[in-house]
Amino acid sequence: MEERPAETNANVDNSASPSVAQLAGRFREQAAAAKETPASKPTRRKPPCSLPLFPPKVDLGQNGEEKSPPNASHPPKFKVKSSPLIEKLQANLTFDPAALLPGASPKSPGLKAMVSPFHSPPSTPSSPGVRSRPSEAEEVPVSFDQPPEGSHLPCYNKVRTRGSIKRRPPSRRFRRSQSDCGELGDFRAVESSQQNGAKEEDGDEVLPSKSKAPGSPLSSEGAAGEGVRTLGPAEKPPLRRSPSRTEKQEEDRATEEAKNGEKARRSSEEVDGQHPAQEEVPESPQTSGPEAENRCGSPREEKPAGEEAEMEKATEVKGERVQNEEVGPEHDSQETKKLEEGAAVKETPHSPPGGVKGGDVPKQEKGKEKQQEGAVLEPGCSPQTGPAQLETSSEVQSEPAVPKPEDDTPVQDTKM
């Protein structure tokens, strides 16, 4: 009974021990096998997965000899397969452009033609050549015959230059036009100088120049017309000196201003001189004569030189002696009437055959005043010198012998 359990224990131990050892060996073997098998398995499994991504050198060393040639053979196979297709496509392309483009080698123009039809598919390679030639042909008329670019740029430049010309030169052109027609500043300066100091010279020019026009009927009347005309050309040379329009315009304006100034002066003098003249009627003609002479001479001595005025008066007196006897109211001009009346006052013994009466003295003084008015109104013939004054003066001369009392004073007042 003791041996059996011992045997059994031994068997158990043996069975157990070898079992453990065996198990351990088996486990080790299994573990080694397990290690070996997975080591072999991944070597077999990894290369196909790793080859396309990146070829491992270890695998290439073991299996690369087998798998590398197919890898190396596959790309040349693809290249060989793709190359005939590409060559066929290139051949097709080369034939078309070669047929379209004359004198082109089949390969190089084919490659060039490949680029061109893709970029410009509808135009085909012939169109670029055609386009380049007409573009060159178009550039010639564009630049020379019908230059749109050249025209646009000059247009902008011209517009700018024209704007500057319109801004700047109008002042120069306006100055030139003023210099041709006479600058306004010169007109005003001349007018002011003539108003201040040169009015006397203008008065010299005004009286003879316009006494010549009404004095034209005096040609058959005697020495008075000669005296007026001798003074006319003597004083007219300044008018003849001025050939330009500007000077004539200036002189005309100066004469108009002189007329206006003289009218104002004489109207004031006449208004002041009427009443003392009418009050001095009973005085002797000798006293009234020099006063009248002073009145007659004062407006003219203001304007011309004193010597010319004296010469003019002397010639007028000589001519008026003859005219008082011969000339009637029909042939008398306004100037001759006033000059005759002035002569009658100056030289009382030569008065017409009615004698010097008290009634004649107002006539003479009125004639003096009329002469002053006429000197003012001769050139312009302003509305003051109307038919009334002519009629009154003609009446005074037509009836020299009839003694008229102071009834003419209202007539004179109406004139004024």
Swiss-Prot record:
User: Record's GO cellular component, any one?
Assistant: actin filament
Output compositional bias ranges, type Basic and acidic residues.
244-273, 292-349, 360-372
Q: Give the molecular function GO annotations.
A: actin filament binding; phosphatidylinositol phosphate binding; retromer complex binding
> Phosphothreonine modification sites?
124, 336
PTM comment text: Dephosphorylation results in its dissociation from CAPZA2.
- At what positions is Phosphoserine found? 17, 68, 82-83, 105, 108, 116, 120, 123, 126-127, 135, 143, 177, 179, 216, 244, 267-268, 284, 298, 333, 351
Which portions of the chain have biased composition (kind: Polar residues)? 8-20, 382-397
The protein's superkingdom reads Eukaryota
InterPro entries attached to this UniProt entry: FAM21/CAPZIP (IPR029341), RCSD (IPR007850)
Q: Which intervals of the chain are annotated as region Disordered? A: 1-84, 98-416
Amino acid composition bias (Basic residues), ranges on this chain: 159-176
Quaternary structure note: Interacts with CAPZA2 and CAPZB.
Q: Tell me, what does this protein do in biology?
A: Stress-induced phosphorylation of CAPZIP may regulate the ability of F-actin-capping protein to remodel actin filament assembly.
> What protein name does the entry list?
CapZ-interacting protein
According to its UniProt entry, this protein's organism is Homo sapiens
Q: What is the lineage of its organism?
A: Eukaryota, Metazoa, Chordata, Craniata, Vertebrata
